[in-house]
Amino acid sequence: MVDLSVSPDSLKPVSLTSSLVFLMHLLLLQPGEPSSEVKVLGPEYPILALVGEEVEFPCHLWPQLDAQQMEIRWFRSQTFNVVHLYQEQQELPGRQMPAFRNRTKLVKDDIAYGSVVLQLHSIIPSDKGTYGCRFHSDNFSGEALWELEVAGLGSDPHLSLEGFKEGGIQLRLRSSGWYPKPKVQWRDHQGQCLPPEFEAIVWDAQDLFSLETSVVVRAGALSNVSVSIQNLLLSQKKELVVQIADVFVPGASAWKSAFVATLPLLLVLAALALGVLRKQRRSREKLRKQAEKRQEKLTAELEKLQTELDWRRAEGQAEWRAAQKYAVDVTLDPASAHPSLEVSEDGKSVSSRGAPPGPAPGHPQRFSEQTCALSLERFSAGRHYWEVHVGRRSRWFLGACLAAVPRAGPARLSPAAGYWVLGLWNGCEYFVLAPHRVALTLRVPPRRLGVFLDYEAGELSFFNVSDGSHIFTFHDTFSGALCAYFRPRAHDGGEHPDPLTICPLPVRGTGVPEENDSDTWLQPYEPADPALDWW
């Protein structure tokens, strides 16, 4: 196997499409916002592609912006040299340069987020050069440029013994399919360079390099003789080593007699070696077919899983939209807030202010150790939905708890203690305690969180408002009135200590139980971890 890795300082290959999905939140530009704030981002480093293989050109807008109505043009060197054109929500192959027709494919699964990928197939040496992508609309135009480098590692070298010449043995090497022009080097057993007797490196019909070189090995250089072909762009080479004994050097007639005597044995050994090679080739072919069958099976399973994932994602978005019908107006209770927290005058946001300036007024509803606050509202029946803007905080807990939970001392945020909460730790670790820690993987980091309580069904669900996806649902039996729970964490380790803010929503319902509701919620599953310490 040949290692095709390249230093990031020079070239950096582009990964597959699945690794290029940008895990970021949805930021929409406001009407009239200056187009200069939008950037077109392409590959950061030059792209290295192998001859005959496929390469991907990713481009996206930052901040994210719906590009479905835009013109997106991939070009080479100049914008009029069209590689691929997307215009008026359709692709226009007739506008392509002849060299790129039937060789491109546009992947626009995330075009609504301003992210697209162009695949270029069957790479040839002439594809090398400068490329760019350009986004254009009535109020915005921008482009990004990058370089494409092309390399071919070439075929396995073929070495042959041509015979005796000028008192030595003549060796000849042939290979093809190299790009750019390779470097050939002969060396003796001591690593010293051997000058070639003949060397020719020429272009072939596919614009690749073919080479032929020979060397005459004399008695002083016999033993191990090696020849290497190096691709300087890839920093890779192919090398052959041949062993030649001194007895094969032309000389006395005794050598000729010995050679004639050993020739039948050499022929037998060659026949045996040929048989072994054929057997190995058949074995490799069998293994290749088995690998292809396994690959087909895995591909089918992957497609099935992707279909199921798409269905679940669509179902979660439908459940979120249904939950919004039960929006309620939630207000923070300042009397419950820990002394280190600051509740806004309108009761809609809470933030950490560090150590309290002095002793807080005593109140039986105030939390003494938990840096949290509850809502004024108490929910003991019906369905209720509210949303909280979490911004870029790296640590928080949100959800609901029993109104009667103890206000003094620490508490474990689990259903057994009367807490049903979702937590974020260190900016990327989302989890719940149910009752053990269950880690959650989110496709898009939420900047706004939706919480839906169905009291009679015993369900508390969380939604990522940034992409409308369902995150997690607690299933339990509630034994008393519940309050909305807010904990911004007093010692946030992030760079953006935004407050937790209750978002205004149009109140469409009163939270009255609804009959014949068969909504279902999806739950990610992970093995339970050992119990955690107090939070």
UniProtKB/Swiss-Prot annotation:
Residues 1-34 form the signal peptide. The keyword Protein biosynthesis does not apply. The chain crosses the membrane at residues 257-277. Keywords: Coiled coil, Disulfide bond, Glycoprotein, Immunoglobulin domain, Membrane, Signal, Transmembrane, Transmembrane helix. It is found in: Membrane. Disulfide bonds join C59-C133. The keyword Lipid metabolism does not apply. One of its GO terms (cellular component) is plasma membrane. It is a single-pass type I membrane protein. Glycans are attached at N102, N139, N224. Residues 276-315 form a coiled coil. Residues 278-535 are cytoplasmic. This is Butyrophilin-like protein 9. The gene is BTNL9.
